């Protein structure tokens, strides 16, 4: 995960001081890209421990089209609690846009089902895109999508994915996002009969919050370890058929967790 450490170093050395919505303050750079070959290992950060259970359950929750935190709570995941209302609702966030994008004539579009079908039928298409950024719904969302658009690409029997993230909390959010979209790429590859290719992560405003700077410096003192391997139940052929038990991470030997507060 050297590319991630390079990003931390770039922000600490070149980042501009900026004010932000949360009032915390950031060091920020604009425009950065990370690339991971999924055949070389699962890109799960090793210089601090990440919560695999939360990563998997959040992704499954998105794929269900769910926007209430009850499913997450039922599985011990609390990462969305700060933004939910008293009933646990978040408004039309990621899952709603992925699975039921509203059209002007009252229909809805299941973008995930559509893109999987397109990969199978027309893998050379340049329209293999899913977007969560819906201008008509942004004001109704508890938190507008940070990772807002992703595109698939098929070549030589391998499926790659590029994510555009408009706002990137580099210490807390980005490691989580890398693992989540790498896993999604592997899942889509499996159900479409392809091998995983590259995951490319393109960042817009890539920032470290001012209360994460010391944690980032600590992390940079740690040497990256060998990447783990993700095993997925090969019997699953439906993108909506995956369960938590279908995923096993082998060889994950990270450095200890580094505590940092979420900016809300």
UniProtKB/Swiss-Prot annotation:
Biochemical pathway: Pyrimidine metabolism; dTTP biosynthesis
Gene Ontology molecular function terms on file: thymidylate synthase activity
Chemical reaction(s) catalysed: dUMP + (6R)-5,10-methylene-5,6,7,8-tetrahydrofolate = 7,8-dihydrofolate + dTMP
One Gene Ontology biological process: methylation
A Pfam family matched in the record: Thymidylat_synt
GO CC terms in record: cytosol
Active site: 146
Domain of life: Bacteria
Location in the cell: Cytoplasm
Family statement drawn from the similarity comment of this UniProt entry: Belongs to the thymidylate synthase family. Bacterial-type ThyA subfamily.
PANTHER family: THYMIDYLATE SYNTHASE, THYMIDYLATE SYNTHASE 1
Name assigned to this protein: Thymidylate synthase
Name of the coding gene: thyA
